[in-house]
A protein has these predicted regions:
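Conserved, structured core segments of small domains
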Residues: 1-118
């Protein structure tokens, strides 16, 4: 099995566009999806990303920039760290995420490079 990082990208205001009922349903669907990944033994970690308080460290001098980091409305909303047989299996796991039913979303699928001892 190989490890993959699934990076979830949305537009910044999409969560506030959902009604309380829609948000509740989204959370239930997301919980079921995560539960399935855990049951299948493929989930290594997952978290949403806070929209505020981010910093960008750049260049060798360590200069800082407060969020947002670019002019795009697209933001990194969270990630999943999974294991899968190959990139195609990882893509299928990403495609099964119920977030696509609720809000405009993109999920990047990145193979992770193993390092010492992994």
């Amino acid at each position: 099995m190989k490890e993959y990082l699934l990076i979830i990208k949305t537009e910044g205001s999409v969560w506030t566009d959902l009604s309380p009922e829609e948000l509740q349903k989204h959370m239930e669907n997301g919980g079921a999806y995560i539960g399935g990944l855990m049951k299948d033994g493929v989930l290594k970690g997952a978290n949403p990303i806070e929209k505020s308080g981010s910093r960008l460290v750049s260049e060798q001098n360590g200069s800082l920039k407060d969020a947002p980091f670019n002019e795009s409305k697209e933001v990194v909303a969270g990630f999943f760290h999974i294991t899968a047989k190959d990139i195609n299996a990882a893509v299928e796991i990403a495609k099964a995420n119920p977030i696509f039913k609720d809000i405009p979303t993109k999920i990047e699928v990145h193979p992770m490079m193993p390092i010492g001892g992994n």
